[in-house]
UniProtKB/Swiss-Prot annotation:
This is Probable molybdenum cofactor guanylyltransferase. It catalyses: Mo-molybdopterin + GTP + H(+) = Mo-molybdopterin guanine dinucleotide + diphosphate. GTP binds at L8, A9, G10, K20, D69, D94. It is an enzyme of class 2 (transferase). The N-terminal domain determines nucleotide recognition and specific binding, while the C-terminal domain determines the specific binding to the target protein. Its EC number is 2.7.7.77. Pfam families: NTP_transf_3.
Length: 192
């Protein structure tokens, strides 16, 4: 089954100094580099941008469906908003090095596992929750956590038993570049 790709675009870009998703690299905004990679995936049915109220208008100009994260409390509320559409593969808008084969692999594992979430995990336990697939039923869990003021997405994932974890160290080494995200202008040399 193909999934919706939800691109989180509501961050504040504090370390970058300006809206990094609009920063042009090779004549194109950073977020479009991320979306281009997603559009090369075989198991993505459509791309949706999850924007904040302050950047909704500019995100709509890219021609993709946009939903607004009304809560704006971080990735947890962006994912919560995206899950209103159904099952999603979620990524950050600042991930221009996504590997389409890896994204398809995550979706296949998610479909085969029939679990609430399918999340890449490093051997030290660190999760990659913004490079993962989630079922709609995870939305209820996130909603409860948000109501309780618990905003850490990684904690929400760790607290549910029904998760498919993908061991990153067992995957092709070159797939690891898929996790790269731009935080500072110095990071741009990697993709230019």
């Amino acid at each position: 089954m193909k999934l919706i790709a939800a691109v989180l675009a509501g961050g504040k870009s504090r370390r970058f100094g300006e809206d990094k998703l609009l920063f042009e690299i090779n004549g194109k905004p950073l977020i479009l580099h991320t979306i281009d990679r997603l559009e090369k995936c075989n198991l993505i049915k459509r791309v949706v941008i999850v924007a904040s109220s302050h950047n909704e208008k500019v995100m709509r100009e890219f021609g993709y469906e946009v939903i607004v994260d009304e809560l704006e409390i971080g990735p947890i509320s962006g994912l919560y908003s995206a899950l209103s559409l159904g099952e999603v593969l979620v990524v950050g808008g600042d991930m221009p090095s996504l590997i389409p084969e890896f994204i398809d692999y995550i979706i296949k594992e998610f479909n085969n596992s029939r679990k609430i979430a399918c999340v890449p995990r490093w051997s030290n336990g660190y999760l990659e929750p913004l490079h993962a697939a989630y079922s709609r039923e995870f939305r209820e869990i996130l909603g409860e956590r948000i109501r309780k003021g618990k905003y850490k997405l990684g904690d929400a994932i760790r607290e549910i038993p029904n998760v498919c974890y993908i061991s990153i160290e067992k995957l092709p080494v070159e797939w690891r570049e898929s996790f790269f995200n731009v935080n500072r202008k110095e990071d741009l040399h990697i993709i230019t």
